[in-house]
Amino acid sequence: SSQDVQRPVCIIGLGLIGGSLLRDLVASKHAVYGYNHSTSGARSAIKAGYDVTDDMPAILARAEADDALIVIATPMNAVDSVLNQIEEHAPSCGITDVVSVKTEVRELFLKRGMES
C-alpha cells in the first residue's frame, strides 16, 4: 500500500549490507535511521550526515512510535539479542532481515511466536 511505501525504515546493524541500505534509502529521500553497535561507527555515520545512534533501546522506541519497518542487518550471532530488544521496545513493528542465513533466523522468530 502507499502507507507502506512511506513507512520509515529502522536498520539495526550498519555494516556492509545495512550501511549500503541506509545510504541508498537516504539517497532516495526515504525516511530512514539506524543503529550501530560500535560507538565509533555510529559517530562516523553521524559525521557523514546520517541519522544513526549506538543506543538500541532509544532507536527501537523511536521505531515503535513511527510504526517503522525494522530491518535486521547484523551478524547471525547478534540476531537473538536484537529480537529480545525488539520484543521489549518495538513489539508492534514489522520486521525483516538481510542476514545471510535464513533457517536459523526463522527458528528464532518461531521460538518467540513472531512469525507472520
Please name every model-derived segment.
Residues 82-116:
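Rossmann-like NAD(P)(H) cofactor-binding subdomain of soluble oxidoreductases
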Residues 44, 64, 104-108:
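Short, charged, surface-exposed secondary-structure boundary motifs
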Residues 28, 48, 66, 88-89, ...:
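Alpha-helix C-cap/termination motif
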